Amino acid sequence: MNKFYVKTDSELRILITNAATKMKLSEEVVEKDYWISFLLDYIFNQNRWSNSFTFKGGTSLSKCFNLIKRFSEDIDLILDWRLFGYQDDEPYIQRSKSGQNKFNLEMNEKVTTFLKDEFVKVLNEDLKEFNLEFWIDPNDPNSVLCKYPLLFEPNYLFNKIKLEIGCLGKWTPAEHVKIKPLISQVYPDVFKEYSTIRTINPERTFWEKALILHSVCNKPDEN
């Protein structure tokens, strides 16, 4: 059973309302954080491919390390390329530019096929009892959208959770981090256990974001 399962909607509504009031947050933020935490626990502890995922990105900085205060709505995941039969360092073998592009395209096609034909199917089978629905984002074959049962009308947040999943990033350095929903900051005894999530080291995440910012700032002027 999921570590963050709450039996009834009425109980969950009370927990979210009171936590939001005490933390001076909107109910929709606390509600979405609850379902993000729920999904993370499932992916890293109950899903059949749990050992092949690593959590990364801005949401990991706020959720796992409390290093940024911005509420991040998406779940970014690295999928271990060894799941598809590649060797540890196969993506880094010396290739021509066209050869590397071909390799990257082949790997990405394997990921999107896996997500569409296997991963989404298992998500819907495993989590249908919690009224969660999953499908491939029609605008991005590397993303899975999750519709969760809304107890509060969203005002500014996207009312789906997006799982962004790629295979081209290295899954190290990583560490195992314990998380709970925001609700536990007000009700520490509601969830008896933490969920342990394998997460990319925050120094690497900051470094990657710095490189992205550098590349954007140094992009040639098209004019």
Regions from the PLM with identified roles:
Residues E28, K32, L67-I68, N104, ...:
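Short secondary-structure transition/capping motifs
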Residues M23-K24, F65, I200:
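Residue-level detector of alpha-helix boundary/anchor positions
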Residues L67-I68, P91, H176:
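Short aromatic-enriched loop/helix-cap "lid" or pocket-rim segments at secondary-structure transitions
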Residues L79-T113:
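Catalytic palm subdomain of template-directed nucleic-acid polymerases
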